[in-house]
């Protein structure tokens, strides 16, 4: 079972904007891949309130749920209404590539790439964590991203250990439960959790066809990248990068593959032969 922090943030957002009471039962039909999920229905005490939620987000009256490490841009009304789905904030990287790249480049010139910013934040955090008297959540943690991971993880553990039979949104191998996804794929979706693990929700047996193209593209990249990590072969890395929708040129893919493999040599023992060949070519 894989845990993601995005759904719990979306759930908190829904409870807030629909002004639900603690006693209200909230059930969400959520599907997709890790960090790439869509909501297709929201049930409050057994009745759907999805149309109300979607209309509020699409019209801009309700501010969509986001996370600290992603810039807060609204999806267009046309996109939301044409999909009739509520996308998570990570979908901005696919539906607003041009805008997100411009923002990221601006951030890079101001203070470095996101990874460099995270390294600085983590260094500060680990210094603070050395203090055994620390009993508050450091403000620096808000700059890190990954909000609510601890909540999500503890709730999943609680549901399994205590056989809660509770609704959670996790990554699982679906074993054929979804009829239009290969049976051996891992997916992120609404599940019921208890002592036997995660069971896919019976309401979700088919992923919405409108976004299946994107889901297949991203999963194809994930599989190719996993194969490359195992093989240590340059051509496998090249294939994965060329399949990514965020890489727009085969030439860029090759330059990126060479540069990143050499830059991270000490972390890539499986690529020793590949790295030796790349150095020889230089």
Question: What role is predicted for each listed range?
Answer:
Residues 1-8:
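Short, acidic/small-residue loops that bind anionic groups at enzyme active sites
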Residues 10-282:
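Long, compositionally biased stretches enriched for glycine and/or charged residues
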């Amino acid at each position: 079972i894989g845990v993601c922090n995005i759904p719990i943030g979306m759930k908190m957002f829904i409870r807030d904007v629909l002004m639900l009471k603690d006693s209200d039962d909230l059930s969400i039909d959520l599907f997709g891949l890790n960090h790439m999920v869509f909501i297709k229905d929201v049930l409050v005490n057994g009745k759907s309130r999805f149309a109300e939620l979607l209309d509020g987000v699409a019209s801009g009256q309700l501010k969509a749920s986001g996370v600290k490490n992603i810039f807060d841009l609204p999806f267009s009304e046309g996109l939301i209404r044409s999909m009739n789905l509520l996308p998570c904030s990570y979908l901005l990287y696919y539906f607003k590539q041009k805008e997100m790249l411009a923002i990221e480049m601006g951030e890079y010139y101001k203070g470095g790439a996101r990874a460099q910013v995270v390294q600085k934040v983590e260094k500060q955090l680990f210094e603070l964590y050395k203090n055994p008297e620390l009993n508050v959540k450091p403000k620096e943690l808000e700059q890190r991203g990954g909000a609510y991971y601890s909540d999500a993880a503890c709730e999943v553990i609680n549901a399994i250990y205590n056989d809660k039979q509770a609704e959670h949104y996790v990554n699982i191998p679906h074993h054929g439960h979804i009829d239009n996804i290969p049976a051996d794929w891992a997916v992120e979706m609404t599940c019921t959790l208890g002592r036997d693990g995660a069971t896919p929700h019976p309401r979700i047996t088919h992923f919405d066809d409108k976004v299946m193209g994107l889901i297949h593209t991203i999963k194809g990249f994930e599989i190719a990248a996993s194969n490359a990590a195992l093989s240590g072969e340059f051509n496998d890395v090249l294939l994965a990068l060329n399949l990514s929708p965020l890489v727009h040129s085969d030439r860029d893919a090759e330059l990126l593959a060479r540069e990143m493999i050499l830059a991270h040599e000490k972390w890539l023992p499986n690529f020793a032969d590949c790295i030796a060949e790349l150095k020889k070519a230089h």
